[in-house]
Amino acid sequence: MKNFDKFSTNEEFSSVYKIGKKWHCEGVIIFYLNSYEKKIAVVASKKVGKAVVRNRSKRILRALFAKFERYLRDGKYIFVAKNEITELSFSRLEKNLKWGLKKLECFK
């Protein structure tokens, strides 16, 4: 995630949620907005679990994003963890995330 910045304002989140594409995968929802900027946000609500579980979920999603980062187009990405993310293995989540990114046409 060296090349990607974090979201800084609420308006950035709103624009991606409203204008961007959305795809539901097992364990995660992916939002993508094609842009010249490279930004990422990882979100886990309290529905996912307590703070320890939410932080672990976000760490896993960041690690998976770092794995795919060099193959992705520039744009704004938001990954929202679902409550079932805690039950999935890393490899299964990786497969689902790759499939979702492919469906959103995020790969170069």
Swiss-Prot record:
Gene Ontology CC terms, in alphabetical order: ribonuclease P complex
One Pfam assignment: Ribonuclease_P
Domain of life from the UniProt record: Bacteria
EC number: 3.1.26.5
Any single biological process term in GO: tRNA 5'-leader removal
Function (record text): RNaseP catalyzes the removal of the 5'-leader sequence from pre-tRNA to produce the mature 5'-terminus. It can also cleave other RNA substrates such as 4.5S RNA. The protein component plays an auxiliary but essential role in vivo by binding to the 5'-leader sequence and broadening the substrate specificity of the ribozyme.
HAMAP family named among the record's database cross-references: RNase_P (MF_00227)
Family: Belongs to the RnpA family.
Quaternary context: Consists of a catalytic RNA component (M1 or rnpB) and a protein subunit.
Name assigned to this protein: Ribonuclease P protein component
Species of provenance: Campylobacter jejuni (strain RM1221)
Gene (name only): rnpA
